[in-house]
Amino acid sequence: MVGNKWVVNGQKVWTTSAHKAHWGLLLARTDMDDTKHRGLSYFIIDMNQPGVETQPLMQMNGHASFNQVFLTDAEVLPDFQVGELGDGWQVATTTLMHERRAADSLRSWGQASKGDGPIYDQERVETETTMQPYKWYPQRAGRVDLIMDRAKETGAIKDPAIRQEIAKLMTLHKSAEWTARRARAAQEQGKPQGPEGSLGKLAASNVARAAAKVHTLISGADAMLTGEDSPMDGTIAEILVSFPASSIAGGTDEIHKNIISERVLN
């Protein structure tokens, strides 16, 4: 602390939508004598203030959802501290559990399973010239109705192996929806945050991977094509180069497996 302000220096990578955010959540070390998660504090920081620089990371799908953020002598007033000084880890883990639960929301999976809404997520059209509208995200990518339509169109639905893969995807999809229902029920009953957030996040990753596999089996080499004349207007091609992000966003799959093993299996 310098005077009555915290002065922060550091770097954070894989920050989603940081280039669009007005405010950010900052977990910073405020006690250099403590180790690991002790001595960390939680702040809200103005993303447009001096000392805060965001650099979008271009992905192989042509989008830039993730960013790296550089903090150089960025100042934060104590009024923007959340929780107790040195207790930021507890606040951060609670925030992350809510984030994962929101990403795996019952509403999202319910809409996806019913096929509600357009194939494209029209509300996420990027305004920057270097970015294009998203044609996918895990819940939409796993929409079984779209996959079934494509399988019928190509005749692949006659292949029992294809039908088996679609059935596996339906099973994963339903498992994700039920996990979201359990999380919602626990929240409504006032129960503390459990492992449901991590389970739901892993379920979303599994659905995205399974959907990419099924789309490839159904469309074959045509799945690589883009443009208006390609399968599903290029949606399949975008799924193939986008689904790996689902294992990173919201915490990597490996981190969530560690959380589950430590809190449930230990």
Residue ranges and their predicted role:
Residues 5, 98, 102-266:
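Alpha-helical interface subdomain recognition
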Residues 13-19, 60-61, 245-250:
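Glycine-rich phosphate/pyrophosphate-binding beta-alpha loops
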Residues 74-102, 108-109, 115:
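Long, acidic (Asp/Glu-rich), low-complexity accessory segments flanking structured domains
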Residues 4-5, 9-57, 67:
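A short core secondary-structure module
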Residues 48-75, 84-90:
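Flexible, small-/acidic-enriched active-site or ligand-binding loops
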Residues 14, 23-25, 42, 66-70, ...:
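Tryptophan-centric aromatic hotspots in well-structured domains and transmembrane helices
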Residues 27-28, 45-50, 73-75, 96, ...:
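Short Ser/Thr-interspersed hydrophobic loop/turn segments at strand-loop and sheet-helix junctions
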